[in-house]
UniProtKB/Swiss-Prot annotation:
Keywords: Ribonucleoprotein, Ribosomal protein, RNA-binding, rRNA-binding, tRNA-binding. Part of the 50S ribosomal subunit. This is Large ribosomal subunit protein uL16. PANTHER family: 50S/60S RIBOSOMAL PROTEIN L16, LARGE RIBOSOMAL SUBUNIT PROTEIN UL16M. PROSITE patterns: RIBOSOMAL_L16_1. Belongs to the universal ribosomal protein uL16 family. It comes from Nitratidesulfovibrio vulgaris (strain ATCC 29579 / DSM 644 / CCUG 34227 / NCIMB 8303 / VKM B-1760 / Hildenborough). It comes from the Bacteria. InterPro entries: Ribosomal_uL16, Ribosomal_uL16_bact-type, Ribosomal_uL16_CS, Ribosomal_uL16_dom, Ribosomal_uL16_sf. GO terms for biological process: translation. CDD domains: Ribosomal_L16_L10e (cd01433). One of its GO terms (cellular component) is cytosolic large ribosomal subunit. GO terms for molecular function: rRNA binding; structural constituent of ribosome; tRNA binding. Binds 23S rRNA and is also seen to make contacts with the A and possibly P site tRNAs.
Amino acid sequence: MLSPRKVKFRKWQKGRNKGVATRGATVAFGDIGLKAIEHGKLTSQQIEAARIAMMRHIKRGGKVWIRIFPDRPVTAKPLETRQGSGKGSPVGWCAPVKPGRVLYEIKGVSLELAKEALTRAAHKLPVKTVIVVREGV
């Protein structure tokens, strides 16, 4: 699972995920990518599950880039606990995603194989996505 090595604070406020992505909105490394078209939070487990689904489909060929990183801590209180008495303990990491953000990229395999691999990855994610191809490919 992906997680940061060191963070300034153990617990963050949730905040709001407004607007559209301006950074990371184009396919930069690969030939074809998976782009989010709605707001959401992707946990490190979801990011890893999608990566494994892609890698199993493309087997040994090609290269995959993960363009997002889970750097926000997620907290949770124990089950059957009353409200109050502070914020819960950190249980994992998530990456906030805005519409337009490219999540994954693939290069080195045929476009048909890459599209099928990205479709399988999209089924593992909680946000709506669309497959985008870099111009000139």
